[in-house]
Amino acid sequence: LIHISTGDVFRKNMSNNTDLGLLAKGFMEKGELVPDKVTVDMLKDEINNFMPCNGFIFDGFPRTTFQAKELDNLLFEKSLKIDLTIALNVDNNSLIDRLLERGKSSGRADDQSVEKINMRLQEYDNKTKPLIEYYNDQNKFYSINGIGSLEQIKSRIVEVIEDYNNDWR
């Protein structure tokens, strides 16, 4: 499986000054989510770079129902599909603390302001939470506790994947 991180794809496009990267950078600097079309177009390019393959692990994508439907269509064209989605459940105060800490080391403008972080969390509530229903209706949604060490969180993710694989054997 190929791991595709939306953040890595954004950073690559921004550092290469692609048209999509420059668009994304403008939105991110204002603390806004990157529009669906820009995100989907970047991810389509990335997916096509790795074809053919046996599948993907998407990190940070999709974030809206529109993106999910676009991804479903793209994967269908390649005889692939989403098998399961895993959401890390973290309270807003912990998220704010994590992002402010990340902002110190990354230099990301959108991680250095509580106001911008709160704007992103509000956008998340409005645009990303509907994905829970979208994937839940397909029996593809799993939520795990996203608080703890990286090893603890990884262990929870692995457990969900192993349970899924055991259920479908």
Regions found by a protein language model. Name each.
Residues L1, K78-L84, N136-F141:
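Short glycine-/polar-rich loops that comprise or flank the Walker A/P-loop
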Residues I2-N73, E77, S105, E115:
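ATP-dependent small-molecule kinase phosphotransfer cores
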Residues G7, L43, I57, I86, ...:
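Residue-level signature of catalytic and energy-coupling elements of molecular machines
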Residues D8-R11, P62-F66, N89-I96, S149-L150:
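Conserved nucleotide-binding/hydrolysis micro-motifs of P-loop NTPases
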Residues G26-F27, L75-K127:
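A glycine- and Lys/Arg-enriched "phosphate-lid" helix/loop adjacent to the NTP-binding pocket
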Residues K37, F61, L88, V114, ...:
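Conserved phosphate/pyrophosphate-binding and hydrolysis machinery centered on Walker-type P-loop NTPases
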Residues A68-K69, I96-L99, K154:
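Short, well-ordered secondary-structure micro-motifs
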Residues Q122-R169:
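NTP-dependent small-molecule kinase module
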